[in-house]
């Protein structure tokens, strides 16, 4: 197991470097000067603009920290490689840089935003696990019944409907239609993350974003669960258990479910990292004060330190979760050995 973990960590390094390097290269392709956008409607003076470029390491400087000028008096731009190495050096020291627009360290901004994103993703994962696994089991056990047809139809609709559009439909129904129909007696928060003195009211703000974020993933989890459970139920050892007179409940709970859960757990585990990145649209629709919404705004304003910090954080989380999911294989199924025949899980 130890050798396997070390091997996977070493495999993560080129992936991480590749993703961050590609994103750095894209910054040069996307039109628009982020420094000129700092002033908003007011144009920055050449002196202030040059100071900002020096501060954000966008131009080369001498030993005294002054910008190096070329023959025409223009500042010499810092190369992509130099900026990348400068960013990676800061990253090793826990520094994600400073936001162009907000003038604050990116780590401080994310420290405020990250709890909201993690809690939203955690709620969505719990909903996905409960509803997806439960619906998949019911659909497989009640094959070709009304419940199977209902689950199949519902999952097909959820897969086809874009999550952000579902979010807007939920806002329309609970925030307008249902509220007007009941004279305001029944309503649901459709924006923000609360902040009131009532914990109940704060948690109510999580309901619609959680449903939106978990909708597509829950549908896929239910499909995988149904397919895997039906496949396991056709295995020889299940037929042997039936021949011994075990009840269907005992067969499913003690024998079939554990093996059928492995691909589902894999999907749900990996999906947590996907939710952290996929939460960008959901957080934007519901004006959620999380990292996704912050990154979305940063993209529109060319605030690259926040974009880089958000992507870096997501990549690290996804890689760690993938490793934890792989390790969990050995605990779900003792037949699986991650480190080879000589490495006991």
Show which residues each predicted segment covers.
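N-terminal signal-anchor/signal peptide hydrophobic helix marking the start
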Residues: 6-16
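Alpha-helical transmembrane segments of integral membrane proteins
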Residues: 2-3, 114-147, 163, 193-345
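Transmembrane helix irregularities
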Residues: 30, 158-161, 276
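Hydrophobic alpha-helical segments of integral membrane proteins
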Residues: 9, 48, 80-96, 106, ...
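An internal, D/E-rich "acidic patch" concept
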Residues: 62-133
């Amino acid at each position: 197991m130890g050798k396997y973990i070390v091997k996977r960590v070493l495999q993560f390094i080129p992936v991480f470097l590749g993703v961050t390097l590609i994103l750095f290269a894209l910054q040069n392709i996307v039109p628009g000067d982020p420094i000129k956008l700092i002033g908003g409607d007011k144009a920055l003076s050449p002196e202030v603009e040059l100071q900002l470029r020096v501060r954000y390491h966008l131009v080369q400087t001498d030993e005294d920290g002054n910008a190096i000028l070329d023959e025409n008096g223009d500042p010499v731009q810092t190369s992509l490689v130099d900026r990348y190495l400068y960013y990676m050096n800061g990253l090793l020291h826990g520094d994600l840089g400073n936001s162009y627009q907000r003038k604050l360290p990116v780590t401080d901004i994310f420290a405020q935003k990250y709890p909201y994103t993690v809690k939203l993703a955690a709620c969505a994962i719990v909903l996905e696990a409960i509803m997806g696994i439960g619906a998949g089991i019911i659909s497989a056990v009640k094959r070709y019944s009304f419940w199977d047809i209902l689950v199949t139809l519902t999952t097909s609709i959820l897969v086809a409907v874009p999550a952000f559009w579902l979010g807007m439909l939920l806002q329309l129904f609970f925030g307008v239609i249902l509220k007007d129909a009941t004279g305001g007696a029944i309503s649901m928060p459709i924006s923000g993350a609360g902040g009131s003195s009532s914990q109940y009211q704060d948690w109510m703000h999580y309901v619609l974003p959680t449903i939106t974020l978990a909708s597509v993933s829950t549908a896929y989890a239910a499909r995988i669960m149904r397919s895997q459970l039906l496949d396991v139920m056709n295995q020889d050892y299940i037929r042997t258990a039936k021949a011994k007179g075990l009840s269907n409940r005992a067969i499913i709970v003690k024998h079939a479910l554990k093996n059928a859960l492995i691909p589902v757990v894999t999907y749900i585990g990996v999906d947590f990292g996907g939710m952290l990145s996929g939460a960008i649209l959901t957080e934007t629709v519901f004006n959620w004060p999380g990292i996704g919404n912050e990154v979305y705004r940063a993209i529109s304003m060319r605030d690259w330190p926040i974009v880089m910090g958000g992507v870096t954080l997501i990549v690290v989380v996804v890689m760690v979760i993938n490793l934890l999911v792989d390790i969990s294989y050995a605990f779900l199924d003792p037949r699986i050995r991650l480190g080879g025949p000589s490495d006991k899980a």
